[in-house]
Amino acid sequence: SYYNDSSNPCFAGWSTSEVLGGGIVRVDQLVSGDIVRTRDGYSSIICVVKTYCKDGRTDIVTLDSGLAITPFHPIFYKGRWEYPKNIGEVSNIECKAVYSFVLEKDHMMLINGTPCICFGHGFDEGILQHHYYGTHRIIDDLKTMPGWNIGLIELQSGCIKVDEYGIVIGLVYNT
């Protein structure tokens, strides 16, 4: 499954989200406690996971909406869950860091108006199914890392642990 790709499953910082009250905020400006628009309403951000990109570059798909997302991060597009790489062109671009989120509920955050799945979502349908990103295992790992208690974990590239088949099995805090 492509969802097992070891590249960062995240959003570029210049993508945007709507916060409660109707304001539009860049993803790299969101903090724990912000209440963001989800597919089904609003949810509070529990934790922001900021991952620095190797050599300041990463593969990104930029959609017409302005959503800049890694190629294998599931999004809800035209009535179904899809990988961005199947919708737009993958480009290796300058990007200092990418961002992921742990939400309190409704684990489908709207980024540039597109529902995007978040860590620990618990869904097991189609491409959303993931034995790590989609389960509480990732949340358990994040809870052990410096920054969880303040809602901001900063990771370096290479933080994703894979098995001998290249399947994502964990995150490692690497300073």
Regions found by a protein language model. Give the residues of each.
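HINT/intein-family self-processing domains that catalyze protein splicing or autoproteolytic maturation
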Residues: S1-T175
